[in-house]
Amino acid sequence: MQVTETLNEGLKREIQVMVPMKDLEAKLNERLDDTKGKIKLNGFRPGKVPSSYLRKMYGKSFMAEVLNEIINDAPRSILVDRNERSAVQPQIDINEDQKVLDGEADFIFNLKYEVLPEFEIKDFKDIEITREIADVSEQEIDEEVKKILSSTRSYSEGDAPSEEGDRVTIDYLGKIDDVPFDGGTGHDVQLVLGSNQFIPGFEEQLVGVKAGDTKAISVKFPDNYGVAHLAGKDAVFNITVKTVSKPDELKIDDEAAKKLGLESLDRLREVVQGQIENQYGLMTRQKIKRQILDSLDADYNFEIPERLVEIEFNNIWAQVNSDLQKSGRSFEDENTTEEKAREEYHMLAQRRVRLGLVLSEIGMKANIQVSESELQTAIFEQVRQYPGQEKEIMNFFRRTPEAIANLRAPIFEEKVIDYLLTHIKIKDKKVTVEELMKEFDESDAIEKSLVKKKTASDNKKSNEIKKKSTMKKV
């Protein structure tokens, strides 16, 4: 097999592979000889079938197997020999030629691929981040406990007009342009006024009604409503009030906690505090991770494989369009254009690919591994999301290596972040809950803003790096 490099520009490689006709002939003869002693054909004794007859019967199919074997094995062996790592599976271009199948020509094909870039991991011990910590107040625990115990609250029917906090039982029929719509009908629906269970403006118009009342209320579905064909539409609901019930006194005591399966009110408070602390901890963790990624992003600006960027962008873009479709919104509603959005998300894809490569390299040098038990836990978490389909989901993961890889990647990334947290400088800072949540909600906008700033400042440097990498042999 003769291997000739035909392109070496930056990370791009093109390789021409030529397998001489005589080598193909030798491999074909091996298969024919192996088959000769095994095959049984009428009119021939075992092992006595002439090679010429076997060639006539099976020559082309055997040669096709030989070619497929070469195509499957060659990319891996070539990359090993060249000490290169391909960013994605190499593209194989084959010039189909009947003469090759007939054993009358050399087999020539081309490999096209991008190599993973080589770069040095910089010292990250000087990275300094701020760990924001929000304490859980007694008031917050009280409010959450009250909210939880409200689900156990009893109500008593009465004749008085409804007030906020009362529970009404209603039938309703919704119409748009005087035509009923799917999902707009309900019978014996219980609704606590002020719970914001329904769209804005709906519950407010039921304050003051009595049992037996009928009422038509006009509302407008929010522009970002989850059902696209209803988003932004005006609707009229014809309401029949069946009962109005006043809330009984809410008891916050051990007996109320026992209704939830807990031994005491103190235990309920412990559970609630733990849940809130876990929620805030996840937010803190996400902000810590963002700071680490921002620091790493500022330190690296090497060329990255275009194909990896394309794959990442396509994933981001599909999610963006799916979110827009579900909300019934457009790019114009988000104060941008599709062209501008594509540019921004393409830069975001570049950032994520580069950071992914940096984290991968750090993890490899630190010998970070994802254990089988960690992977199994992740698989079981996925299975739990599809009750009744456990067997099918498990089989899916068994036969889909890509799905396993998609589960392994975020686990590996989080373990690398854990590793970095033990080697960087961390300064704790007390913040309010509002400060913690406000900045957390703005994180995506912050990330895209950082991408723009970095891209603007690095354009010249990036061009210089590309010129240098074109000359470099990897």
UniProtKB/Swiss-Prot annotation:
UniProt signal peptide: none
Record GO biological process: 'de novo' cotranslational protein folding; cell division; chaperone-mediated protein folding; protein transport; protein unfolding
Gene Ontology MF terms: peptidyl-prolyl cis-trans isomerase activity; protein folding chaperone; ribosome binding
Chief location bin: cytoplasm
UniProt KW Phosphoprotein keyword: no
Region (Disordered): 451-474
Listed Basic and acidic residues bias regions: 451-467
Catalysed conversion reaction: [protein]-peptidylproline (omega=180) = [protein]-peptidylproline (omega=0)
Translocase found in the keyword field: no
Pfam families in alphabetical order: FKBP_C, Trigger_C, Trigger_N
Cellular localization per UniProt: Cytoplasm
Top-rank taxon, per record: Bacteria
Stretches assigned to the PPIase FKBP-type domain: 165-250
GO CC annotation, single: cytoplasm
Keywords: Cell cycle, Cell division, Chaperone, Cytoplasm, Isomerase, Rotamase
PROSITE patterns recorded: FKBP_PPIASE
EC number: 5.2.1.8
Gene3D superfamilies named in the record: 3.10.50.40, Trigger factor ribosome-binding domain (3.30.70.1050), Trigger factor, C-terminal domain (1.10.3120.10)
UniProt cross-references to PANTHER family, sorted A to Z: TRIGGER FACTOR CHAPERONE AND PEPTIDYL-PROLYL CIS/TRANS ISOMERASE, TRIGGER FACTOR-LIKE PROTEIN TIG, CHLOROPLASTIC
Family (UniProt): Belongs to the FKBP-type PPIase family. Tig subfamily.
Record text about domains: Consists of 3 domains; the N-terminus binds the ribosome, the middle domain has PPIase activity, while the C-terminus has intrinsic chaperone activity on its own.
Role, per record: Involved in protein export. Acts as a chaperone by maintaining the newly synthesized protein in an open conformation. Functions as a peptidyl-prolyl cis-trans isomerase.
NCBIfam families listed in its UniProt record: tig
Listed name of the protein: Trigger factor
Organism in which the protein naturally occurs: Bartonella bacilliformis (strain ATCC 35685 / KC583 / Herrer 020/F12,63)
The gene coding this protein: tig
